């Protein structure tokens, strides 16, 4: 209760003193001096440009999240014959959704020798609908003038280089990209928040506080989560810690820091410090 919610508002800058600069159509340019800040900007999808797929630049190449919005919110189909590059959960879910809506999903193609999605989504979204999953494969060419007409898929070797002679040509009108998510941390970087090079998100303490005192982070801005349940738990922890900070219950200084080191077989840890 009593919380001001500013929609259609873009934050332009956050200073290390927690001064927020923002703009919206109603207030114009505004400054907000915050006592505590919770960063919850989420993440964005990798695009074709980020992964450098060769070929022409026709219509019909979408990120999986964009296609999801087309179907679920706009009520229109992105295409009828679809190839999906990447086996992230959004891509797997869209393979099923597009099939249910009448499209033909020809293949799901994954660069790695394993899928990037949950096993339950592989079973329920691909196997149950007879959609083939090509592991250790990638898209090596996109063909078409005004619209995608063909996609060339090739096997890759252990160095992820295309294997000559392994090409498969799919006649399709749509290519969906489900090739990973990137935590949205431009504002964090501007504010001087220390980022973890492995997660591309803020380095956080066990209470989700970042390297800047009074600035907390949670959800996919910290690292990409598989399940929204984990985001909810993390957000609750960050909110409670921000409230405690405003009441004077701040964490100790650097002398109390205990860094966590990822051991053998562990890629990274969150939090990074306790």
Annotated model-derived regions:
Residues 1-274:
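Residues forming the flavin
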């Amino acid at each position: 209760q009593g919380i001001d919610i500013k929609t259609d508002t873009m934050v332009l800058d956050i200073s290390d003193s927690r001064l927020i600069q923002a703009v919206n159509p109603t207030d114009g340019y505004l400054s907000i001096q915050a006592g505590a800040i919770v960063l919850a900007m989420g993440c964005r999808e990798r695009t074709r440009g980020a992964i450098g797929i060769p070929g022409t630049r026709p219509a019909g190449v979408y990120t999986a999240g964009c296609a999801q919005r087309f179907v679920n919110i706009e009520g229109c189909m992105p295409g009828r014959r679809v190839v999906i590059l990447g086996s992230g959960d959004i891509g797997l879910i869209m393979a099923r959704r597009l099939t249910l809506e009448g499209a033909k999903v020809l293949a799901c193609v994954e660069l790695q020798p394993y899928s990037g999605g949950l096993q339950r989504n592989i079973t329920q979204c691909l196997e149950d609908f007879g959609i083939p999953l090509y592991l250790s494969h990638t898209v090596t060419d996109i063909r078409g003038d005004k619209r995608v007409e063909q996609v060339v898929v090739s096997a890759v070797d252990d160095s992820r280089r295309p294997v000559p002679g392994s090409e498969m040509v799919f006649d399709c009108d749509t290519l969906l990209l489900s090739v990973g998510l990137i935590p949205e941390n431009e504002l964090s970087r501007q504010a001087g928040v220390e980022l973890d090079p492995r997660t591309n998100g803020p380095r956080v303490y066990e209470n989700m506080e970042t390297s800047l005192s009074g600035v907390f982070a949670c959800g996919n801005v910290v690292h990409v989560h598989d399940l929204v349940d984990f985001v909810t738990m993390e957000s609750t922890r960050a909110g409670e810690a921000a409230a405690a900070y405003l009441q004077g219950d701040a964490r100790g200084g650097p002398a109390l820091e205990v860094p966590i080191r990822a051991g053998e077989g562990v890629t990274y840890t969150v939090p990074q410090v306790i």
